[in-house]
Amino acid sequence: MSAVNGTPWGSSAREEVWAGSGVEVEGSELPTFSTAAKVRVGVTIVLFVSSAGGNLAVLWSVTRPQPSQLRPSPVRRLFAHLAAADLLVTFVVMPLDATWNITVQWLAGDIACRTLMFLKLMAMYAAAFLPVVIGLDRQAAVLNPLGSRSGVRKLLGAAWGLSFLLALPQLFLFHTVHRAGPVPFTQCATKGSFKARWQETTYNLFTFCCLFLLPLTAMAICYSRIVLGVSSPRTRKGSHAPAGEFALRRSFDNRPRVRLRALRLALLVLLTFILCWTPYYLLGLWYWFSPSMLSEVPPSLSHILFLFGLLNAPLDPLLYGAFTLGCRRGHQELSMDSSREEGSRRMFQQDIQALRQTEVQKTVTSRKAGETKDIPITSI
């Protein structure tokens, strides 16, 4: 994450540059607060302000009391959790990254080193797992609209629980490492936690799979199933459904445009996740398998790619804001359509009632005429 911290979870080949042993330690070049790092800090501050404001606004919008006539949407609950994860990234990862680049070395002590590395990875796990939950929810909403939605809470709990458990190793791997001379220097690193190089590489690959590869695969499967399900002939033909099921399905799908917006929103969340983090993780893989490339790749490239990854946190509330505005317009159109349908229904009922009254009057008149003809004529 910083000049000495090249991956999102902190373990990097860069640590070996200054935290080695013997002659490497004495002759290594210590990191400095370079011009590229200064630009990175400035951009991080801008991202922090925009992400904090946007995600706090999303939380306020989702948690405020809603009109009684509107049923709470599952999408709102899901984006409340996504906003919470983005806020965790905002208030842990961004300030930590900016401060660490300014101080260059670690000045907060061993306990803060372990705790902040744990919180940082937990925040990034949550921000990666919650879009998967959104994809699973959209898959259930599209492919099985009549099914129960109670499983969403379990999925949300599993996402947060896994984020906590998978980040726990950070508490034991990271610690402060001190360098006595020629210039005293302290850093938060994994130096000495791995007995062999392959162990560190295995841990990095495992974290990479859990942070990026597995969530990306799960989301790709979800949206592929949605596309296949929507395009299948069975889904398009509604005439084969029983009458009762068709009526119930209409009651669930009375807002198709809102459902379509929710699906588009989930797809945009997936696309932003891919676009923001793919370049940085690919660079991390390059570092792990070819540490010599550290001297060939300019540090500014690592700065740019990580800032591009942090852009994901302020983008999510913008997507939700666009979705909310679209839903409000949809609700207005829906209310207008409902009022028109209600007026048409009342006019139809009035016409039916008038026709019935006319038929009744005709029947009464014809009966009276028949009774008059049946009266016998007597002579006086």
Curated annotation (Swiss-Prot):
Gene Ontology annotations for the cellular component aspect, listed alphabetically: plasma membrane
Modification after translation: Phosphorylated on the C-terminal cytoplasmic tail.
| Topology Cytoplasmic: residue spans | 61-76, 137-160, 225-278, 324-380
Kindly list the biological process annotations in GO that this record carries. Answer: cellular response to hormone stimulus
Q: Which UniProt keywords apply?
A: Cell membrane, Disulfide bond, G-protein coupled receptor, Glycoprotein, Membrane, Phosphoprotein, Receptor, Transducer, Transmembrane, Transmembrane helix
Q: How does it sit in the membrane?
A: Multi-pass membrane protein
The entry's localization annotation reads: Cell membrane
Cystine residue pairs: 113-188
Glycosites: 101
Q: Which residues lie on this side of the membrane: Extracellular?
A: 1-40, 97-114, 179-204, 298-303
Q: Which domain of life does the UniProt lineage start with? A: Eukaryota
Instruction: Show the stretches that span the lipid bilayer.
Output: 41-60, 77-96, 115-136, 161-178, 205-224, 279-297, 304-323
The coiled-coil regions, if any, are: none
Q: Name one GO molecular function term.
A: protein-hormone receptor activity
- Gene3D superfamilies to which the protein is assigned, alphabetical: Rhodopsin 7-helix transmembrane proteins
Its family?
Belongs to the G-protein coupled receptor 1 family.
The entry's function note states:
Receptor for gonadotropin releasing hormone II (GnRH II). This receptor mediates its action by association with G proteins that activate a phosphatidylinositol-calcium second messenger system.
Q: In its UniProt entry, what is this protein called?
A: Gonadotropin-releasing hormone II receptor
> Corresponding gene?
GNRHR2
